[in-house]
């Protein structure tokens, strides 16, 4: 994907469907933030009577002949001294939404005068690029009118910046968003198509695409041979066999530092015998968003050729309902040897993650483990769709993730591992139950996973993306439905804190 181009001189720009001109909000009237103003001043002068320059304000002006573009879009950036990187991300996402609705496919984007920017030009350009890329995406439609979807942008030329600075940022963000789009496509896909086998094939495809990536897939028999009794239990009710996927990237083979990413891969969650209500089941094709996220992250890391070692583990299965389904009140033993009494078959995600954690400890020699899962409704209630909660046993890892979230505007919030609540997992007949009480559900789910670390000195973080992985509205910097949340944050984290 090569969407972005740059041109230092505005006068040498190529023809396009539209040009985006930025404005600052000042006391008297909006001030054009770029030197190209004189060329279009006669066009936008009248529009300024009703245009304030507020952040995110946009207005189209049709060009009757002058200039190289059919339309001028004036964009408010708000007050210069108040503009943040997240603001840049969101306003250029809005620009993309506006351009696409107007059927524009080629666009010239004028940068504000660099010397006037209060934030580093690299940050501005990165977030401009990310905002445009995030909304330059179509989720799948199956109607006869699918072809009437707003067209994608095919060429974006950023004016006022030399290619030496811009092109490196463009290529990097395009590579990252290939991973974001992969994540979104998988989460948005039909559950009958995005099966455990499909996830395995995607992993194999990445291994073919990148020489430094290897894929290994365990089928049902291999899962049973490894004594992954918790993953096998969840899979019992499905006509589709489970898979356990191991995808390894070796960017620094001589280093012992090793990051293991684990993604929950429940490709459809009916709740099992503890059947979900129909409305709650409606979006459960997205219950494999954790798996899709780690595939997207690994794709981006490999594309950027980062000097790190990363392995993605994906326990993949449906949680379906059948006469053979695993049953509440029964006890199943995981790969760790720990036994679990099933308090709810709808708390299946933590079961398959537990076997993946054990696999990581046994075979991967991890320095750190980071898992992603659409795990609890409690997290959605707590933090909504804009913030993902996370838990960690390591303050350094937690702080680094928090910083990465701030830099990428993918908000994380650390929640406590309240040890007192661990007793809610007590079972009289097994080592533990898979659910706690009806309170602090996100915390007790994290405490359940923490037990499978078995006190080994491994840094660990658990990201509950139940609220952020899938959105019901097209707003801010995200399209409707699958968001791809977490891919950008983790790639930033890996690049900044681990690429040494």
Swiss-Prot record:
Binds 2 manganese ions per subunit. Its EC number is 3.4.11.1, 3.4.11.10. Mn(2+) 2 binds at residues 264, 269, 287, 348. Keywords: Aminopeptidase, Cytoplasm, Hydrolase, Manganese, Metal-binding, Protease. It comes from the Bacteria. Its cofactor is Mn(2+). GO terms for biological process: proteolysis. The active site is at residues 276, 350. It catalyses: Release of an N-terminal amino acid, Xaa-|-Yaa-, in which Xaa is preferably Leu, but may be other amino acids including Pro although not Arg or Lys, and Yaa may be Pro. Amino acid amides and methyl esters are also readily hydrolyzed, but rates on arylamides are exceedingly low; Release of an N-terminal amino acid, preferentially leucine, but not glutamic or aspartic acids. Mn(2+) 1 binds at residues 269, 346, 348. The keyword Nuclease does not apply. Coiled coil: none annotated. It is found in: Cytoplasm. GO terms for molecular function: manganese ion binding; metalloaminopeptidase activity. GO terms for cellular component: cytoplasm. Presumably involved in the processing and regular turnover of intracellular proteins. Catalyzes the removal of unsubstituted N-terminal amino acids from various peptides. Belongs to the peptidase M17 family. This is Probable cytosol aminopeptidase. The gene is pepA.
